[in-house]
Amino acid sequence: KNNLFDGILGFATDEDSQKLIFNGYLNLELNNNLNFGEQFLLNYKADGKDQQNFRARLTLPYLFNTPFGLITELKIFKRDSTFSTSDQLIKVRYQINPTSKTYLGYKAYESSNLRKDNSINIDVEDYTSKFLLAGLSYTKTQNNILFPIKSKFHLDTEIGSKETKITTESQLRASLLFYYIFNLNYKNSIYLKNNTKAVNSDSYLINELFRFGGINSIRGFNENSIDASFYSVLNSEYRYQFNQDIYIHSIIDFAYFENQITALKQKLY
């Protein structure tokens, strides 16, 4: 892969606090610059006031010329003046064969309530949580420059506990990603993708729920605008490929989600 860089960043003054705020996005991807397959990703996105998203990820494969690799990641999400959440990940990857990998690791979450007025009960609290995680992935490639990956399966499970100022309770989190390209012929194909996530707990906070919506999940909704304790999104596309560089596609997305805090169960499309 080539190195990639793309971004637009701006700044303005908040009318209420008079503080400097940033908006825009930044995407940086560095691949194999040290010639042993390493990858560094840096993503930042902010819309000025409502939310900020930061992600940094380092992948070091084949440590000491073995099938073992190391992955570290930091994510920070801030929703206006309501809360901020960070999660830190470290996991060891084992390359079973060219298409399959397994993972073992540790993940920690930390979230802070940013509200100045705590008299309004919106189920946001400070909390920390710690998890042991295990996962596996399978990737199949194909001879296509535009769509080099034909199918992918990725499963992650996290077992641990959440601690607030009042309680400590066990939690289980799981995520599944699957997609497949059905090649009708060289120019025509159908793309299907499913992304499912769930958290099981005795109680729930808004700032620990999954967030989805936007171009990377269900298109047509604002990014990260939907909070869910469980969701499943199905993306489908019909693709027509003109050549190795250009294609057009249709979009049909479906989703189902549950929010245990509001007892909401809803379908989206």
Which residues fall in each region the model found?
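Gram-negative/organellar outer-membrane beta-barrel architecture
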Residues: N2-H154, F182, R211-G214, N224-Y231
